[in-house]
Amino acid sequence: MSFTVVGSNIYDTTLLMTRKGQNGAPDEVIPRPGFLTLLLNDIDSLRTRVELHNLIDNLNLATNEDYVKFAEYRTLFSQTTDMIRLAYTNGQPAVQTRATDSRTGSVFYANTLTGDKAGNLFRLLAPIAYRYLDVGLPRLFSYIHAQIGTTPAFRYNFDIQPIIKLAITNEPLDYGEWIGQEGIHELERNVMIILSCSNITILAVLSIVGLGVGSHIMTSAADQEAWVGSPFMLSTDNFGNARPFTAPNPSYAQTLRLPIPRIFSAPNRPVWVQSKTSETQSVSGSTHSDEKLTAPM
């Protein structure tokens, strides 16, 4: 599994893990928001990954205010050598660790942290998750767009559970106060985003189930052909009907607007989250095999 870093700080970094496609299928790229890996690993552990050296050197983590906040949790997860993720179990926050069934060999995730400690961790992560949606997700899309036509087709399997939920419950951005619980439930059903730019289109389908989000970003020629020329971003309104949003700027590199998470209109509240992407991206990568660090989501 190859490993690439896209980003320059805790809030805009995405870790891209690439798996070789089976039986002629395109390689699968798994983007994971980087803030969980960066915040829940001590600096020495992070330095065991060559790909992270430049990022760690530039961050000065030891004095970073957000990094300091998570000292207790770094101690708690210090013995974790496999992937962890955040999840909601029966509506309650939980931290899960990847495990292997000794009888069948199948991989599953078991709860390793629940209750108040998990809830406190989620509250600490909420504002960081919102910042990732605002600056990290647009940067990732910009990176993916730059790869189209220069590399073989990849299938981007993007699991950002439960960042959307974290972001929409972040004080003072509590969407329950703005649109009510019915609006929250509608938001958790289905959202489709189409990003169009010139002759290239990136299709991102966010299928929102329960309190989590799973999405697939496809950049194959077939997907491009199917959606080229579409000038819209689509989302569902609070009645479940698809509605178009005219792309505000055909130059993708200059401006990217995402209807995440501000899907619904509210009095005196902006509907759009607007993020400007820089022309230069800080990207580093290598091809070390397997993943040993605590990985996000």
From Swiss-Prot:
Residues 275-297 are annotated as: Disordered. GO terms for cellular component: host cell membrane; membrane. It comes from the Viruses. It is a single-pass membrane protein. It comes from Cryphonectria parasitica mycoreovirus 1 (strain 9B21) (CpMYRV-1). Its main location: host cell. The chain crosses the membrane at residues 191-211. It is found in: Host membrane. The lineage of its organism: Viruses, Riboviria, Orthornavirae, Duplornaviricota, Resentoviricetes. Residues 288-297 have a biased composition (Basic and acidic residues). Keywords: Host membrane, Membrane, Transmembrane, Transmembrane helix. Residues 275-287 have a biased composition (Polar residues). This is Uncharacterized protein VP9.
